Amino acid sequence: MLNNTSSDFDLIIRQQPNRARVAGGKEKEERPVPVAPSTALAGTLVSSLHRLKDVDNSDGGFFVFGDLSVKIEGEFRLKFTLFEMRKDRVSYLKTVISERFTVSPPKSFPGMMESTHLSRSFADQGVKLRIRKEPRTMLKRSTRPDEFHQPVPTRSPERQSVQIPPSSSYGGYPPAARDYGYYGQQPPVKRHRTSIDYGRQQGLYDVDGRMARQMDPYGQPTAAMYAGQPAAYQTPAAMQTYNTGQVVPDYTAMYPGMQASAGMQASAPMSQIPDPTGQSRSSQQQQAAVGQLMAMNQPGTPTPDSTGAMMAQGYARSGYPPSSTILPPLQRSRDYPQGTNGSARAYFDQTPQANTPILPSQMVNEGDRFSSVTGPTTFNHPDSPNGTPQ
């Protein structure tokens, strides 16, 4: 057994106590080492040897007191004593005393200091220590009067709200760099529709025929609806007189001889519309032609035209007065021989097939429509062998 004396050991306080605050509250009943209760000190009063690395990376043995407090206010010095503990006895080795430090009450305590580099190094090596990254004095220091939070001014003098005078033109957009006021200061300016706007809207609809049709689908006729369009879409005079109240005359029952007596060109194509300037007939001649048409075209009278053969024989004509404008025939007329009285007449064989009305949706061949004749138009009348009307 070796006899160790105080000359074999050297105790150095690496970190001196600087200041402390009076500790309060009850002490812990369970202690790692049972010692006699102290009237002045609180916390862990005993520490074991820790083999740690110093800040210069050298090995050393350190006694760390991380939970040591003073319960009395005043100025004190700490005394550390080194003991060697054996199985059956404890040997005193050496003692060291710290520098003087002040224990202050909580009201006058300036605050905890920042953890030193040595404490951080021990904490990194596994020692349980409370590390403070910044001093507590910076967190709990008194606030100066000039550091109080100043309220934000409602409006700086340099930036005032620009009041825009009311204008009736509304010509352009507002400038993007202007300063707007707060929402609660004045109500938003709304644009009210004036009589000028209504006039512009109605003028737009008058010019554009499509707008007029959408606004009033049951209004004026088509000719009045498109009255404001450019002259590039002019309609012939014969087509402009149509409206919803007029009745289209029946052109399917017209005789070619009547068309010749009225002075109309029977050889015009079906899709061709005559020029209104070329019509030299007067209104009296047109009315006379229409009257002759209605007198000769009685219900049940057979018609020589193929379109008339498709209509029912008992089709009742409308009693409304016909239009003053007569359109060209729908199909090309045939050259029928004229009689001695100057009027053209034609006859065809009234067979049961010819008397049967044929609707446009039914299929019909050329033989049923023209009495099985593919050559020039001839009619087999009972009175003449060659088809010449008597």
From Swiss-Prot:
It holds the Pfam family Velvet. A motif (Nuclear localization signal) lies at residues 273-280. Keywords: Nucleus, Sporulation, Transcription, Transcription regulation. Its main location: nucleus. InterPro entries: Velvet, Velvet_dom, Velvet_dom_sf. It is found in: Nucleus. Gene3D superfamilies: Velvet domain. One of its GO terms (biological process) is sporulation resulting in formation of a cellular spore. Component of the velB-VosA heterodimeric complex that plays a dual role in activating genes associated with spore maturation and repressing certain development-associated genes. The complex binds DNA through the DNA-binding domain of vosA that recognizes an 11-nucleotide consensus sequence 5'-CTGGCCGCGGC-3' consisting of two motifs in the promoters of key developmental regulatory genes. The N-terminal velvet domain contains a NF-kappa-B-like fold and is involved in DNA-binding. Forms a heterodimeric complex with velB; the formation of the velB-vosA complex is light-dependent. Interacts with velA, velB and velC. This is Spore development regulator vosA. The lineage of its organism: Eukaryota, Fungi, Dikarya, Ascomycota, Pezizomycotina. The gene is vosA.
